[in-house]
Amino acid sequence: HLQVPVVSYIIRDFLKLKASDADTIVNIHVASEKFAELILLLESNENLETVKEKLDDEYLEIPTDLVKRVFAGLILREIKGFWRVALFISILVYPEVGNASDSLGKQDELDKRKERYISVERSITNLDLDGVWKMKPLLDGKAIMGVMQVKSGGPLIGKWQQRLVKWQLAHPQGSMEECMEWMKQSEQQSKRQKIECST
């Protein structure tokens, strides 16, 4: 019981909402934190290298010009149709721009937040990501097992499914054949590197 997030506990037990509603609100809360990182990336590129490092691994390197699309796409796939709500919350709790002391200052602050919301929303729609959660994987677990030439599933296949989503976000026009080719090449390259490291 101690593992249940406090927000979820309050919503489910105190407010007596359905478990699915509680989960949705917790997901919005989590996504709004991730949006804070995304806003920084979209507005200034300040954390580009940090985000890129999170997305990359030995099998997949995201091209620098596609980091924004992949990172935003992963957040939207988690939060789905509630992404605008999560973005709105993130903008509200975002560190304030300057210290507004008078009413005019507060109005300026609100205007800045409104502009920021519109700007980030436009960036996401320009990246063609609204509805990205409906994107079907080019390969299912069975097909991945075939490409990897393994007999059973497990964590390995799960990791490849996550990589596959990133690859598709980075290659929106990519075909199943191109995806399989990338997987084979990545696997071979990784094996070569491991052999070189051990010799």
How would you name each of these model-derived features?
Residues 1-199:
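C-terminal subdomains that position terminal phosphate/3'-OH groups for nucleotidyl transfer/ligation
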